[in-house]
């Protein structure tokens, strides 16, 4: 353990609070969830109750190097976030900008192939079979406020008609 406690630690180009416990701190990185973080910490033999700021620079580099290889040896394949990659066929675990890039490419590939999912993406509709009759609406809403605003005007016009007769 390092003598100096760091309140802000930079992991994968992201500033993370050093007072957080290791699994929660690693879960702040895009592409790493709590369960994956726990598995990585267990694989490295670190204490899951330790704070991120207590780690030395070498230990932080060790965590980064294990995750940046895209395959974490010794972890089950169902824990990876990209199984059977389209181009390579390998099980990968992607983080940060790599994950964003691959997901964007997947969506563009589906749009080009004009698959059902690609068509839904291109139309800006829900993709995974959700109902769309009432939820997921976008744009301007014509709500109750217009109806209420119309009611006083109709009452005024009816009162004017009564006065004129």
Curated annotation (Swiss-Prot):
Assembly notes: Part of the 30S ribosomal subunit. Forms a loose heterodimer with protein S19. Forms two bridges to the 50S subunit in the 70S ribosome.
Compositionally biased residues, Low complexity: 153-165
Keywords from the named record: Ribonucleoprotein, Ribosomal protein, RNA-binding, rRNA-binding
The keyword Ribosomal protein is assigned to this record: yes
NADP as UniProt keyword: no
InterPro entries the record matches: Rbsml_uS13_C (IPR027437), Ribosomal_uS13 (IPR001892), Ribosomal_uS13-like_H2TH (IPR010979), Ribosomal_uS13_archaeal (IPR019977), Ribosomal_uS13_CS (IPR018269)
Gene Ontology process terms (BP): translation
Record's protein name: Small ribosomal subunit protein uS13
